[in-house]
């Protein structure tokens, strides 16, 4: 495979833009991973890596997550560097801390890889369980802990204990009823609390996650409540405890203008609080830093029209400008950029278990006494091959669709038999294929027809995974994730395909794909080789997907492999997750595997079977109980 073909593959799947320099197509036509773009020699062929791990770890079965902790650390360095440049550029005198909200991915490998990176990093918790995880890892970072979410007294006490241990723990007030509990528990523990307030802004981002920001958001205090909080603290001489201002515009903000507008409004809260005598020291802009899942660099829901540097510049300039205008000190800026930290670092790899393709047969004329829809279809087919054809491609397609609809209607009323219906459907497929061959992708008028026919004619690839477990946001909120074969891209991409999972649910299908023209309903694929089926990679699944995945059809967590790539060519890995067994999933729903085994054994013993067959059936059942929930190769 030469460089020209490699470049073409980069464009075909838009990988050059969504890959973030971490993923690219190599000269062999396989996807390569470069976990640290600052060390371009430290790279690994993903397909070869999967095969190596399968060979060395005989028990490993696909699907499996391949995780690259070095990407996490590079993302952390990149975000910190962007804010350092912005502060230097605008003469910003305050500090900056990136805080990781662990709800994005609470896996141990993620928290420990980030906390042990040597980079400044804070941690954020939104529940008691998360706070316990954060406190246990806080000794590795020694910076900032932000406590969000609704809180009971136990949550509050844990946070105050963290303060007592020497951490900077900010209890962010989300509702007015929390403040009395915080003050009471702080007095009992003899701790001066560090408080934050989450202000509910009028500004709101757009997109799939817009409800998490704005005036109707679930969390935060309205302007009147912020004033009440200030007076409550002033009355008990605890105004100095209120040190952090927090706001949240929304997750995955696509438009930089929304970010700039939100920062400008929140900066007014900072100014007004100082006028009230509140010495706010930290300005937490929350989440919102998005990633470009589709690589279009646009304002669409799964893209962003800005980069790290522009984001940092807008945040730092917006806050600094308001401070300078009113002669106020520059606060420490905090961002909670969990998605931007984690999305790139994980790839789900799985195997294709089967393909359903349209088969094109030799066309034959209908019977002389065939019904009108059948003869009309044949006339359309013949006219398409005649030199004097005056029908447009669109007209031929519409005529064929109308005739096929009439065929289905007549079949439903018993006027046509199954053979006639099958003949009509095969001829219609041939008409569609002929129209496809004559369409010109550069003709804008042809694009809707091309898209329609690609979807109609696409191969169905059945992939060994659960959309609901591994890509829950693709099902739940129609989020797009980059998907492509991780091998065989040196072959012509002369097919279009859709991917279906193995659940018994019609929603288990990937509806949207990234290609060179943006987003499409099908994906380009090489011709399917049953002797060497391709492995499929689902990219940028490191944020939220692992923790949101559900157990539909009792498909469980997949295996996970942590991979480290070094510039001397060395590659090491360890399997951090075994993947759920059938027994694991049954126990989740309170079905005891031992009880099931005993009941099945009773049935087998009571059946009229010879001893050898009984033992075989029992062994098969027991083996299945402790096997992988996904389809396993023999």
Swiss-Prot record:
Catalyzes the biosynthesis of agmatine from arginine. It is an enzyme of class 4 (lyase). Keywords: Decarboxylase, Lyase, Magnesium, Metal-binding, Polyamine biosynthesis, Putrescine biosynthesis, Pyridoxal phosphate, Spermidine biosynthesis. Belongs to the Orn/Lys/Arg decarboxylase class-II family. SpeA subfamily. This is Biosynthetic arginine decarboxylase. The modification N6-(pyridoxal phosphate)lysine is found at residue 103. It catalyses: L-arginine + H(+) = agmatine + CO2. GO terms for biological process: arginine catabolic process; putrescine biosynthetic process from arginine; spermidine biosynthetic process. Gene3D superfamilies: 1.10.287.3440, 1.20.58.930, Alanine racemase (3.20.20.10), Lyase, Ornithine Decarboxylase, Chain A, domain 1 (2.40.37.10). One of its GO terms (molecular function) is metal ion binding. HAMAP family: SpeA (MF_01417). PROSITE patterns: ODR_DC_2_1 (PS00878), ODR_DC_2_2 (PS00879). It holds the Pfam family Arg_decarb_HB. Its EC number is 4.1.1.19. Substrate binds at residues 283-293. Pathway: Amine and polyamine biosynthesis; agmatine biosynthesis; agmatine from L-arginine: step 1/1. InterPro entries: Ala_racemase/Decarboxylase_C, Arg_decarb_HB, Arg_decarbox_C, Arg_decrbxlase, De-COase2_CS, De-COase2_N, De-COase2_pyr-phos_BS, Orn/DAP/Arg_de-COase. Its cofactor is Mg(2+); pyridoxal 5'-phosphate.
């Amino acid at each position: 495979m030469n460089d020209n073909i490699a470049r073409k593959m980069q464009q075909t799947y838009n990988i050059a833009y969504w890959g973030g320099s971490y993923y690219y197509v190599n000269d062999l036509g396989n996807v390569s991973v470069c976990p640290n773009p600052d060390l371009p020699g430290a790279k690994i062929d993903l397909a070869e890596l999967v095969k190596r791990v399968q060979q060395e770890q005989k028990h490993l079965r696909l699907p499996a997550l391949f995780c690259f902790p070095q990407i996490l650390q590079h993302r952390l360095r990149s975000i910190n560097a962007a804010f350092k440049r912005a502060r230097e550029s605008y003469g910003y005198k305050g500090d900056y801390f990136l805080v990781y909200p662990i709800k994005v991915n609470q896996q141990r490998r993620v928290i420990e890889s980030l906390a042990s990176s040597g980079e400044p990093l804070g941690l954020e918790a939104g529940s008691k369980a998360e706070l316990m995880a954060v406190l246990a890892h806080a000794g590795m970072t020694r910076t900032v802990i932000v406590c969000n979410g609704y809180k009971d007294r136990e949550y509050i006490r844990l946070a105050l204990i963290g303060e007592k241990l020497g951490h900077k723990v900010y209890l962010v007030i989300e509702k007015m009823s929390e403040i009395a509990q915080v003050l009471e528990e702080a007095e009992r523990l003899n701790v001066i609390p560090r408080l934050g307030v989450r202000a509910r802004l009028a500004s709101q981002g757009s997109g799939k996650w817009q409800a998490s920001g704005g005036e109707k958001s679930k969390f935060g205090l309205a302007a009147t409540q912020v004033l009440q909080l200030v007076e409550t603290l002033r009355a008990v001489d605890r105004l100095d405890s209120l040190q952090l201002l927090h706001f949240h515009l929304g997750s995955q903000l696509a438009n930089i203008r929304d970010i700039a507008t939100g920062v400008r409004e929140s900066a007014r809260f900072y100014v007004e609080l100082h006028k009230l005598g509140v010495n706010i020291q930290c300005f937490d802009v929350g989440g919102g830093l998005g990633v470009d899942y589709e690589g279009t660099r646009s304002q669409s829901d799964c893209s962003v029209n800005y980069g790290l540097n522009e984001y940092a510049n807008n945040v730092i300039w917006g806050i600094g400008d308001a401070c300078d205008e009113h002669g106020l000190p520059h606060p420490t800026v905090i961002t909670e950029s969990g998605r931007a930290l984690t999305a790139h670092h994980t790839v789900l790899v799985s195997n294709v278990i089967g393909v359903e393709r349209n088969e094109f047969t030799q066309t034959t004329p209908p019977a002389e006494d065939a019904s009108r829809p059948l003869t009309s279809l044949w006339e359309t087919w013949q006219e398409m091959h005649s030199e004097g054809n005056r029908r447009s491609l669109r007209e031929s397609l519409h005529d064929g669709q109308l005739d096929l609809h009439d065929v289905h209607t007549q079949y439903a009323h018993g006027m046509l038999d199954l053979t006639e219906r099958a003949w009509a459907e095969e001829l219609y497929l041939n008409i569609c294929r002929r129209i496809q061959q004559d369409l010109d992708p550069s003709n804008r008028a042809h694009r809707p027809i091309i898209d329609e026919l690609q979807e109609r004619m696409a191969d169905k690839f059945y992939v060994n995974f659960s959309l609901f477990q591994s890509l829950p946001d693709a099902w739940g909120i129609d989020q797009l994730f980059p998907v492509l074969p991780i091998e065989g891209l040196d072959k012509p991409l002369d097919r279009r395909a859709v991917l279906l999972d193995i659940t018994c649910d019609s929603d288990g299908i990937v509806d949207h794909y990234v290609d060179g023209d943006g987003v499409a309903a099908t994906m380009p694929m090489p011709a399917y080789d049953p002797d060497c089926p391709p492995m499929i990679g689902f990219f940028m699944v490191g944020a939220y997907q692992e923790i949101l995945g559900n157990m539909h059809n009792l498909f469980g967590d997949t295996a996970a492999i942590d991979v480290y790539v070094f510039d001397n060519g060395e590659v090491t890995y360890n399997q951090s997750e075994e993947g759920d067994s059938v027994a694991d999933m049954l126990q989740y729903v309170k079905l005891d595997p031992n009880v099931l085994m005993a009941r099945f054994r009773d049935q087998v013993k009571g059946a009229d079977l010879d001893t050898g067959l009984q033992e075989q059936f029992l062994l098969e059942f027991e083996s299945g109980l402790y096997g992988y929930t996904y389809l396993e190769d023999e």
